Amino acid sequence: MIDNQKYVILSLELHLFFSRIMKEHALFLEAGFTNKNYNLAMEADHYKKQFEDLLSYTVSASNGIIRPDILYSEELVTTLTSVAEQKTEEFTGIEINKNITTRELNLQSGVNPQVGQDLVNYVAQLNSDAIRLLDGLINFKERVLDGVLSCTIFTSNYPLLLEHIIHEANLYRSYVVDLENKIDIESKNAKEIELFWDHIMMEHALFMRGLLDPSEGELINTSNDFAIKFNELIEKTNEMTDSNIKNITEETLNETVEFKDFKEAGASGIEQCKIKSIILPLLADHVLREANHYIRILESYKNM
């Protein structure tokens, strides 16, 4: 059981990371529909706005509360996020609340913050809102995936990407439910966490490989190499025991840092129009933040 202080801190940190991820999932869905599916695009836009609101309310309560390592990991926003949002808005015509990013860049961390009952109640409402919104968004994503697999909907998003964003939403929801039950989400089974994020990293590499222009041979090959490497790490992690867990975690951390560097160079290259692809700048920044998130988790295991 976690106390009120940890409940508040973990909840706010969770929403700062994942509600931004969810609003961007909705934007990627919206951008991927054709004119025929205007109603689906508008439904995606609805969820984008709802998760923007959730993120905004979370930012309002987070200053001086969240931990330094979360703030400095660049899993919430990166140095590229603001420009990525601006360019993605220009490319798609989809409105993005960029003020939230500015506010997040100005957040300050806290150490042993005072948490009163009013803040506990505020966070409980955020968690309740998050579960309600996630139930709707997961259902929407599943309907889109079903339509794509039955060939009744066309989208520029891969079916695997749709499955990928459903898995992330389900993970987010499970964490919110755990927090409402006062379960410490940081004490989750390390093997399960590593397997989840290894799959996510592998799929990122596959998406990047498939969204780069065919002329970008070197980048395509590097993306493919990362996909192979994370697939190997999945196999190793599946067989992980107490005797080799530290070695495998260390190997995974090193590989994820390398992949993060590749993603960062790619995001910068896409923003500067130096890489030929059909990757939205915000998608490049999105996958970079997820790598940063995983790196922080792996580093926390090293220190245990």
UniProtKB/Swiss-Prot annotation:
The keyword Chloroplast does not apply. Disruption phenotype: Inactivation of the gene produces changes in the ultrastructure of the spore. In thin-exosporium spores, the absence of the gene leads to a thinner coat layer. Inactivation of the gene has no significant effect on the presence of a polar appendage. Disruption of the gene does not affect the integrity of the spore. InterPro entries: CotB-like. One of its GO terms (biological process) is sporulation resulting in formation of a cellular spore. The keyword Transport does not apply. This is Spore coat protein CotB. Keywords: Sporulation. It comes from the Bacteria. Its main location: other. It is found in: Spore coat; Spore, Perispore. It comes from Clostridioides difficile (strain 630) (Peptoclostridium difficile). Contributes to the formation of thick-exosporium spores.
